Amino acid sequence: MKVVILAGGRGTRLGELTKDIPKPMVSLLGKPLLQYQIELLVRYGFSEVILIVNHLSQPIKDHFGDGADFGIKIRYYQEEKPLGTVGGIKDLEAELTEDFLVLYGDVMMEMDLKRLVNFHNGKESQATLVVHPNDHPYDSDLVEMDEEGLIVNVLPKPHSADLIYHNMVNAAVYILSPAIFPFLEKGKKADFGKDIFPRVFTDLKMFGYNTPEYLKDMGTPDRLEHVGHDVQSGKVKRRNLENRQKAIFLDRDGVINENVDLIHKPEDFHLYPFTARAISKINTSDYLAVVTTNQSVVARNLTTIKGLGEIHKKMETELGDAGAKLDAIYYCPHHPDKGYPEENVAYKIDCDCRKPKPGMINNASRDYNIDPLQSFMIGDSEADMGAGKAAGCTTVSVMTGFGLRKAKTKPDYLFANLEEAANFIVDEPYKNLAAKVKDLASTSSKETLVINIGGNTRSGKSTLATYLQKQLKADGIDCLRITLDHWILPKSERIGKEEVFHNFQIDKLESDVQSIINGKTIELKGYTPHPDYDVEDVTYKLEGQKVILIEGVVALATENLRTISDFKIFKSISEDLLKQRMFTYYDWKGYSEESIQVLWETRKPNEYDLIAQNEQFADLVID
């Protein structure tokens, strides 16, 4: 397959950088942008490139010559005058007698070109456009596709202010067949995105190839700097779909938007105020943002696939307006229960995609080479947690929406909302601490290393303990985690002032923990953080684990607990944040605002102020 690269861009917005060279020759970490494209083509076995040049073409010719030094044959077509993205290609009609690849020479790209070619051939496409969501769709050329990827509409910029759209943008990479040429006019300046594709998508078999791989224009100094950072950090190469990807799978209702029952029209769809910030945070990371949502409203005949698409258009438009994007959306329109009036029987089936089955996660993992073991599932229901666990993901519940109430499948992590969860996953705030703990464990001469994690309620102790446990396991270090909340008395047996040591049965707790360390088996009734959860029996037994993690409010509160610890961590929290989290947590548990205020005023002097003093005993304090 021949390749045509449009390499005549002036790059006027780059100012002095393109004073003496064309835009594709702008240096990026000591190498012209165009050279990155040439090297990519060589890597995927392309053997012949035609560079369409005009403005300041000599620097390109001097650098690349005939391509021999780069392992590829390069020829040049010199335009007499600039003819946009179309004119030069029309002039090459006699040479381009088979399908050919078109690149824009001012785009930094890193993608699996073999996948692209296979997609094009598999669809028997006459024109394949590489497309992707971006963070500024409102000023980009947009396309709409059906379930098979067939392009059913092309919407060139500019767009009307009230347009509701799917965030799917022309990424300026195409595979075209000779069938395109009758629609191109010789000698006339034209643009594929603005003038040609909107006119021919009904005449040609035209498909969109959606990829999360790296494709960015470098038209401004800020974008150039951003791309340079991504190249240097390795992000550009990591996004190639030859490499295993990481994803954050997102449930929709109750996580991204307010959980109105059975949303079946756009006017009932409302994003949470924090959602765009959270998804934008994911977009800055190596994680893909992928929605997996059960939408039985189709099976119930409350809406159609097209109607569901209109709801998703609203979601994508509002996110795009805020600079956020979803890399992909997977939905299950089915429901297994039949026999209801007005149902859509075509979708009343027992499918493989409806959560808690992992079908949607598995499909996304196949489509984008995602490793579920490096990925997260964020949801608000037991079905979400079940799907995530079945696929092998780390599971995260949020307190919004259903809030995982009345669930038997517990998550790995619990956060207030999507933003809090996304910040934790992306920022990985305990990464350095985990490295320190791993070093302690691997160098300790003790048979078992005991680490205590103390701090006030809602300070993040459990989150920290879970993270450390997972990081240790990933390095092959077995860990026994002792959660001190399991010694908390049932609510009916606690004393009125919420005296912390009484409520934790401190004498029994100290004795039991010492017994566990000595190798004895301890069985407890356990503790549940939510009144809708079943209380489950807990058994603790040390069975050769290298590390014991003791985690709880009172973990540093007594001399006996401190004495058995080899490394003591205190998780601190400001009073304002503690109060905020407490109100969120007890609201999730069903308390009224008034009762939470009373609880705060009672527990602050009898627990929070008391536990805060334990910071002085820590070997390490974590904010």
Question: Model regions: which residues?
Answer:
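Acidic, Mg2+-coordinating phosphoryl-transfer loop and its flanking beta/alpha structural elements
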Residues: F376-Y413
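N-terminal nucleotide-binding beta1-loop-alpha1 segment
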Residues: M1-K19, N243, A247-D253
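Conserved nucleotide-sensing/catalytic segment adjacent to the nucleotide-binding pocket
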Residues: L480, L489-E536
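Conserved N-terminal catalytic core of the sugar/cofactor nucleotidyltransferase
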Residues: K2-I5, K31-G105, E110-R115, T220
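ATP-dependent NMP and nucleoside kinases share a basic, alpha-helical "lid"
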Residues: K313-E316, M385-G386, D534-Y585
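Catalytic-core segments of class I nucleotidyltransferases/pyrophosphorylases
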Residues: F100-L101, M108, K114-N121, N134-P137, ...
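Conserved Lys-Pro-Asp/Glu-containing loop-to-beta segment of HAD-superfamily phosphomonoesterases
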Residues: L101, E343-A346, D352-M385
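Small-molecule kinase domains that catalyze NTP-dependent phosphoryl transfer to phosphate-bearing small molecules
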Residues: G403-K406, K589-D623
